[in-house]
Structure formats: C-alpha cells, structure tokens
Amino acid sequence: MGFSQNHLNGTGCPDLGDILILPFCGDIQNEKYKSRYEKEYQKAHPGYYSVVLSDFGVEVELTATQRTAMHRYTFRKAEPAHILVDLQSGIVSKNEQLRTHVIDAEMQLLDQYSIVGKNKVKMWVEREFFYVIKFDKPYIDIEELQPQEGEKAKRLLLSFDLKPGENVQVKVGLSTVSIEGAQEALEKEKQTI
C-alpha cells in the first residue's frame, strides 16, 4: 500500500505505478505497510486528493503536475514518524513480477533531504525513468530493507524527528531523459498543496 507517482488509465495493460511512498507512525511490526482508511475522511477534486490513514494517524495530501508530485504528510500521533520509499514497486500482472520487473536500478542519497536515481523496468514495454525525491525536513535515520530474491531496486525506511501535528512535504520529479531533467521538472513545475 502507498502512493505511487504515475499511472496508466484504461489501457488494459499493467505498467507504471513507480516510486511507491507510504507514511506511517510507530514501530514496524512484521513489515505490515498497510492501513485502513475511512471514506468519509477522503477529499478529492481536480488536482487534489487527501485521506487519513487511520491505523497510522497520518493525514495524506497529494497534488501533481505533468512531471512532478507533491505529498504532504501530517503525523498526528506521538509516535516515531517514518516514510517508506519503495523503488522496487510497480503495477504488475502477477505478484511474483514485483521482484523481477525492475531490470536495473541506481540510487544515490545526496544528503538528508534528497534521493536521486534511475530505474529500468519491463512490464508492458521496457522503459527507463529518472527521479529526484526531495524532503522539506531532514530524515534522522535511514534503513535499507532486505531485498527479496531477484529484486534490483531498493526499499528505504526513513525516520523523521517530528512532534504530533507536524508534517513532512515530499516532492518527486520524474524524467525519461536524465536526473537533471527530473530536477528541472521540480524547479519549473512548482506546485503547492
């Protein structure tokens, strides 16, 4: 479960769903990265979506432009705040394809605010994309989750030092050309929630 950055709609084939991000509070138990939500707390209109992840006590707000996404996560609980960044995830036909659809991946942590990289994936078609992920607050700890057999991309668990009611904003830029193109998208296609 989480929020990915791109989707195909109505094509009849699985693909995209790249860079899954999930905010949560508390300790990790059995790697259960999922939460219930209540429909009455969902809000949606063109260019905006919000929902409360009730198990985690996190309010999620999302918006996007053509090549960027912006997330704002408000952590309501007095528990450790985390964000899972899953670079292996994607939309696939069968669960076992989750481990093999990424055929090459590179990722670099620039500082405590930025992650950059590229993935080469094959599902419906073979494609390569580049990304820049920026946080408005520094993460204080990072853990790389153990990959399953055949996986090429990383799953990162970032921890943040937040008080109840504080938020973290995450901006994601995408490009099919270069990391610089993803960075340029973030600079040119500025959006706010």
Give the ranges of each region predicted by the language model:
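Accessory carbohydrate-recognition regions in carbohydrate-active enzymes
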Residues: M1-I193
